[in-house]
Amino acid sequence: MNCSIKARRRMSMKLIKMEKVKDGKYLKNYELTYRNKAGKEKTYEIVSRKELSGIEDIGQKVSGLSIAAVNGDKLLLLREFRMGVNKIVYNLCAGMIEEGESLEQCIRRELYEETGLQVKRIIDILPASYAAVAISDTKTSIVFVEAEGEFEDHTSDNEWIEAGFYTKEEVRELLKTAEFSSRAQIIAYFFARGVL
């Protein structure tokens, strides 16, 4: 397929209306009405962490981050109970950027709150990407850090987290048997193969 055909198909999908249908404490539900490539209307549902005042606001704001932390030759993974799936999964340290907080402040706060660890060095910060593109406009950054310190629990009563550092061999075994969030799984995969 040549580029001009691809471009015409992309341009033929047009968002014509957005309506908020629910305003929850943490999530806002919206119905988007599109005109599809056949010229028919298609209603699509999304959730957003941010208030969207118009179509132009969709996917514009970075709401949080995920932290890929290492200590020497070990990767930080969290065993975390996630209410959305009603089970414990392996996850990265992650969280939402608070009002008035910089990305670097959020990195340090979230790592400390969820693990008790400190940021020794920020290695890299990737540009924000969509966290769940099929259902949400939420954008988060993936951050790579070196962490140090002792594990401590500073989480709220509504969180259950066990943090630990894992070797490449341990991570390889977890990838065969444990359930992961998608971002944690891809970070773990590359770490276990020596790419990270």
What are these regions (language model features)?
Residues 2-12:
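Short, Lys/Arg-enriched N-terminal segments with co-localized hydrophobic residues
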Residues 5, 16-17, 84-89, 95, ...:
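Nudix hydrolase/Nudix homology domain
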Residues 64-66, 140-142, 160:
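Short glycine-rich loop/turn motifs
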Residues 12-23:
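Short amphipathic beta-strand and strand-loop transition segments with alternating hydrophobic
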